[in-house]
Amino acid sequence: MKILVPATSANLGPGFDCLGLSLKLFNETQIQKSGVFSISIGGEGSDNIFLKKNNIFVNIFYEIYEKLSGKKDNFRFIFQNNIPLSRGLGSSSAVIVGAIASAYYMSGFKVEKECILDEALIYENHPDNIAPATLGGFVCSLVEKNKVYSIKKEIDKDLAAVVVIPNLAMSTEQSRQALAKNLSFNDAVFNLSHASFLTACFLEKKYEFLKFASQDKLHEINRMKNLPELFEVQKFALENKALMSTLSGSGSSFFSLAFKDDALALAKKIQTKFKDFRVQYLEFDDNGFEIC
């Protein structure tokens, strides 16, 4: 079997831990039953020995597979990782979702996306990345009694993303330590209103309001202080036809959304100005993970 799992960008400014969308940048994993266990890694993380010795995908896969099938089989895993690691593009969610869905498939169980999403919550306790990685599109999610509830909206084909990827790894745990311990009532109301309005903008295609709807007072500023150049990236993107520009997940990547006609030019301009960063033009994925 082969499974493709997309990269994701979460939070989208004010939608902390509840909003996310799916990008056409995929981790690809092939799994075959084998007489002996083996693992091969290409792309991102291919030079990381730890990923071979203690691979999270493999660990979760075997845990779920043995629980479902009652068997202890050996498998050959071939990874082609295209999602940058620890850059705020959902690399850990792609691993979790991919491992669970693969285990269900190889165990002979029906792969139901709602079931996969609830199972993924065991390994990642916020749904902002795992939901779009599973469902695709723009997704608003919440957790109620250990169950994920999500509403998905397909993203217009005339929109595209420009993702700026610094050479700075940043784990979610590390990034959360930078968050303020207390929040004022006014700032809480600010984020609630902006996250709600941002969601409505995607649902009703009111893209002209995204620039101010995507503002945040909860997490972005504190996280971006780890890499001050990101403030310049955001300002530059918004001055050059980005409809919105936000920290991607916990960082360090930065996500901008624009009309396709503007996005490619924006990517080139950002790459010219910020030569030390990797810049990618990406379209949006509306399917979530796919088993081939």
UniProtKB/Swiss-Prot annotation:
Gene Ontology BP term (one): threonine biosynthetic process
Q: Which SUPFAM superfamilies match?
A: GHMP Kinase, C-terminal domain, Ribosomal protein S5 domain 2-like
Q: Where in the cell is it found?
A: Cytoplasm
Catalysed reaction(s)?
Answer: L-homoserine + ATP = O-phospho-L-homoserine + ADP + H(+)
The GO molecular function terms of this record are:
ATP binding; homoserine kinase activity
Positions of ATP binding: P84, L85, S86, R87, G88, L89, G90, S91, S92, S93, A94
Name the domain of life this protein comes from.
Answer: Bacteria
Pathway recorded for this protein:
Amino-acid biosynthesis; L-threonine biosynthesis; L-threonine from L-aspartate: step 4/5
Q: Does the keyword Nucleotide-binding apply?
A: yes
- Gene3D superfamilies named among the record's database cross-references: 3.30.230.10, GHMP kinase, C-terminal domain
Print the keywords alphabetically.
Amino-acid biosynthesis, ATP-binding, Cytoplasm, Kinase, Nucleotide-binding, Threonine biosynthesis, Transferase
Kinase among the record's keywords?
Answer: yes
Q: Which Pfam families match?
A: GHMP_kinases_C, GHMP_kinases_N
Q: According to the UniProt entry, what is the EC number of this protein? A: 2.7.1.39
Per UniProt, the enzyme's principal EC class comes to: transferase
GO CC annotation: what is one? cytoplasm
Role played: Catalyzes the ATP-dependent phosphorylation of L-homoserine to L-homoserine phosphate.
UniProt similarity note: Belongs to the GHMP kinase family. Homoserine kinase subfamily.
- Name of this protein: Homoserine kinase
What species is this protein from? Campylobacter jejuni subsp. jejuni serotype O:2 (strain ATCC 700819 / NCTC 11168)
Underlying gene: thrB
